[in-house]
Amino acid sequence: MRNSVKKWGVGIAVFAAIVTTAVLLPQDKVTDFHEKYEGTDLTSDIKGMERAGTYIRYIAGHDSSVRPQENVNIELFDYTSAKDVERYTSYEGVDEALYTGVDSTVTWQINVPQSGYYNLYTEYLIPESRGVVAERIVYINGEIPFESARNITFSRIWTDGGEVKVDNQGNEIRPTQKEVFAWQKAYFRDDRGYEAEPYLFYFEKGINELTLEAENEPMILKSLELKSVQDMDDYQAYLEKQPGVNMTETGTSYQQIVQGEDSTLRSESSLYAKYDRSSPTTQPNSVTNTVLNYVGGEAWRSAGQWIEWNFEVPEDGYYNLMIKARQNYARGSISSRSVYIDGEIPFSEMKEISFEYENDWNCMTLTDEEGTPYQFYLKEGTHTLRLEATLGGVGSILEELEDSIYRLNQIYRKLLIYTGVQPDKYRDYNIQQVYPEVIEAMDLESKRLYKIVDEMVAYSGQKADNIATAQTVAQQLERFVKNPNKITLEFTTFKDNITALGTASLNMSATKLDVDYFVVSGINAPIKVEKAGAMAKAWHEMKSFAASFVVDYDAVGDVYEEGDEGVIKVWILTGRDQGTILKSMVDDTFTPDTGIKVNVEIVAADALLNAVVAGRGPNVVLSVGADQPVNYALRNAAEDLSQFSDLQDVLSHYTASSYEQYRLDDHIYGIPET
């Protein structure tokens, strides 16, 4: 009896301890490191460890409050020197335009009426070329003002090259992408996204020289000017400038759903429509067929990338905006977007809207801090909504982190010269005496990193794995300062931690996001918030599981019965995107021209051998290793291509060395893949 009572007592005590821990743990405050860097001037530099040429230093070199209010137009054809340029007349609706080629350098003399900071602004068109962004280097009075002015980028415009097709299995096939050659307006900005605002360029009063040098891609300029720096209106100022209207019930109850996959324009060809079967609330939805139902994903990750949609409103008035999006890529991170309506950010709050980490879709109405929906004034007719990836508040933190990584590499290189790659752990290098500035730099950099950790945690609300790397380096530097003898013992680890910090910085600059749809609605229209419950998710998984027994997810495009005469089975060992492109090319040209039907299937590389042994292999396989054709030929499992009379015609497109590895005893068993 006593043993039973004793056991019950121990059990109750353990249970009480668990409950107490569960209650108290959530109340713990997230500790910060402010005590480590408070009172320290983190802007100071250690001689020999500073980073020159940064944008922050450039801005600090002049009075940033001097911002003239007058724009300065630059006459494009009044250049003082130029190379690889041409004057166009009557081009794309413009009377005159200046073509600047891939090797171009153009210099203008500008009479600036007042000293101060200006934005550089241009209207441009990128003609047909390699399909990548255009890049220009900016010189002011013969000098590059700051390092990142070496890489000013200008995006292209892409759209769908046709309608969405449906194969004979009911699967949607996305159209190819084609480029749109149209005029665009752009400020000169930070292509990394660290600076959310356009770059500020300082010009002295009087005659100044401005030079644009091409890094790649031609550009055609319609206009170029120095724009006065203007502060954007906040929401209240925006509302005060809008007219008062009496909307009818048609307008106040209006609602239009625009699917994410129906975007009209995009900045890169990779931002096309995708399909998702993971959530029951994705619209439209199918567990058996490939249905294009969202846009974004891994490709929509870099600052400056944008996607644009068209929408309509029935009358002049005020409308709300809701975006159904998902950020399930990085726990502890925030993906941000700038909202443009008809090419302009309507008010300052739309410079950055944030999507926090969540496994499922999040229906987010654009609201103020109190939860009141923003009202956007729109005139009757068609409008555009553009979402542009931005780093937002995290950009300045990442800029500090990049500077810190640069200085850490300087510290490492200085020590490397002295100690070598593998320091002798039994030798006292007296680093604190030989390089006292290195110890001082380590102490300062440790405090800077602690501050960066605090800033990132304050921004995101939690400490993610990537920023924890910065804390690891800060703690290591702190150990080095307290005991310099540890430097040589942990030298390899120090190098690895710097590398890991660089990787973490790249990961944190990725701002991925999916968009299912957005809703434009009148101010009285109810907005349905879709959220999948446990039962809906369970039913969705059951349907997906059942479908896996009857649906061939490996097949791509139109599928023909293998018993049909003249059907060729082709296996491709890469991804579905490559398979879809191949199947589209086959169906568009090869099958109509030859009458030969082709089934394309996506197959794992390790399945090929088993299939061949079982007698169920393909007629053609693509993307195999270079050694495989001969390996299969040795076992009489590959076809000798030498028997075909037109083989030499095919091989004439290749150099002999490219297919020599597929030769065995004067027979050819494979063709290079291009």
Where are these regions (language model features)?
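Structured segments of extracytoplasmic/periplasmic soluble domains
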Residues: Q109-N111, P127, K227, N310-E312, ...
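Disordered inhibitory propeptide/activation segment of secreted metzincin zinc metalloprotease zymogens
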Residues: N524-G566
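Early extracytoplasmic/lumenal segment of secretory-pathway proteins
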Residues: D564-Y632
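A sequence-level detector of short linear motifs
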Residues: F146-E147, F347-S348, N599, D640, ...
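Extracytoplasmic
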Residues: S4-G11, V19-V519
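Hinge/lid segment of periplasmic solute-binding proteins
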Residues: A546-D564, Q628-T674
